[in-house]
Amino acid sequence: MKSYLQSKLLSWFPRLNSQVWILATGRFLSEVGTGFTLFYAPIFFAKGVGLSATEVGLGLGSASISGVLGRIIGGSFSDSQFWGRRRTLLLSAAISAIASFALAATNNFFTFVLANLLAGFGIGLYWPATEAAVADLTEGQVRQEAYAVVRLADNLGLGLGIILGGILISSTGNYRTLFIIDGISFIVFFGVVYLAIAETNKGNGETSSTTRKNRGFLPNSWQTALSDRLLLVFVVINIIFTTYISQLHSTLGLYFSSRFSSQIISILFSWHMVLAILTMIPVSRFFKRFNHPQALMISALLWGIGFSLIWFIGGVPNFQLIWAILGMGILAIATVSYTPSAAAFVADIAPVTLRGVYLSINSLCWAIGYAIGPPLGGWAMDQSPGLTNSFWLVLAFSVSGLIAILQYLNHIFRRYNQTQERR
């Protein structure tokens, strides 16, 4: 009986290259440290250091600017023969550790901005390198599950870090310790990559046959990527999806605050996170039966249903909490159905020698979506109650346009696959 239960438990986990599991473990440890500081940084720097709310906002926002630069450089570094995936990950961990220790020592606005610039740059380097490494270590339908495992490690580490950070603050009140722990977690991640991760970029150093001749200021690899119609159509789709996701992290809390108590809001977001963690691997496994554009169409439908349920909170006065619970649950599944499929799609269409650049562009879509989403949602929340509530209905209806673009993507993706099969 015991061996049967063990075999059933092991069968739940996908069979992946051990390097993927090691990378996910390192990321879990790193995200525990990030969770320590995620919600407490604005509080500490406003109340503990004495920065104004505007200064805190500017400082935290500067990380997004350097993050864009980090993603661009990270993509090029990941594809280079000198840096590769492994060295780029090591550089990311080292810079992130320095940034965390700098934040722990911050006493003024200048060092606060400098530390955030470093932090954003370090995280920007991370995403193209790690997603390219996962693509190198997997192929076919397994790749989608591998991305789900890495995202699961992110969510588990972040959730545990938030809980432990809250316990530490409530017992000691020492905010600077949180940033020191964050820095140590990046050092641990550095050690895991250095000792246990081999370079996965097996390119021969030659220019890809798909790479265009340089006819402008952009590097050849970026010109090639930005001339790929499949990728460009997906960029539009990806920006829309990330704009949706940004509403969960910025606008939804504001919308709930006028309808529910802070305790209820905390429970709703905890329910959302727990369900996302529990369904990440089962959902990615279920979606293996579809191609990537089809999986993203299902995800889009779930986003539309989720936003409609959020609209019911204000549009249908009765059972507000029930609508909120259902809406947050559907949006959790919508999120986990999107992230692995999106990354796996980009990895599948990218030439092997350009995976870092392609996945860098995929990561940049998140930066653009998060630049659009919060201001848009904030503007909607400042309007009259009727318009504020209608915002969620507009988002739900926008899904029809997204599905139309996804149908076009599916059409050209099928043609792409037919061309690849003839070669």
What are these regions (language model features)?
Residues 185-206, 405-410:
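C-terminal membrane-cytosol helix-exit motif in multi-pass small-molecule transporters
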Residues 70-83, 279-292, 381:
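Helix-to-loop junctions at the C-terminal end of transmembrane segments
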Residues 1-17, 200-236:
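Juxtamembrane intracellular "pre-TM" segments in multi-pass secondary transporters
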Residues 13-64, 230-268:
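Helix-loop boundary and gating motifs at the non-cytosolic
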